[in-house]
Design a protein with these regions (language model features):
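Conserved active-site motif detector
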Residues: 1-140
Length: 140
């Protein structure tokens, strides 16, 4: 590896860790999906299980510039979105239009009228690294 490239990588990693610390982010992050009460999301969550792979995709909307969808890879459906505060932090860290990896930690409320899901968010981008257009997301 070229010495300049090696130095660039080390500086990038240092700045990345510093930015994570400043934003209060420690990966993997644990959180829950929001906006899951609609019938489409409930149907998708009912079919989901712990360990299912997710993508967290930043899709700016008119009144929600930091909107981050929780997208199920096996189901090809949107399960919900992240809360606004966490979304803002992730947009600051990864920049607009990011797509990062995640997984379902567990599905909650299986014996109740409304199900939910807890998420584990990673700071990697490998599960769908070849996808750049997310306009096809079902439920977005």
């Amino acid at each position: 590896m070229h010495i300049f490239t090696h130095l660039q990588n080390r500086i990038y990693k240092f700045l990345y860790r510093r930015k994570c610390k400043r934003l209060g982010l420690t990966f993997p992050l644990l959180c829950k999906a929001h906006g899951v009460k609609n019938a489409d999301a409930q149907g998708a969550i009912a079919q989901s299980k712990a360990g299912d792979r997710l993508q967290l995709v930043h899709v700016s909307k008119e009144n929600y510039p930091n909107n981050v969808y929780v997208y199920s890879i096996p189901l090809n459906r949107v399960l919900g979105y992240l809360d606004e505060r966490l979304s803002q932090k992730l947009v600051k860290l990864f920049k607009k239009g990011f797509c990062i990896d995640g997984a379902i930690e567990n599905v909650t409320g299986e014996n109740h009228a409304v199900r939910g899901c807890n998420l584990r968010i990673f700071d990697t981008r490998v599960m769908m690294s070849d996808v750049h257009d997310f306009s096809h997301l079902h439920g977005a």
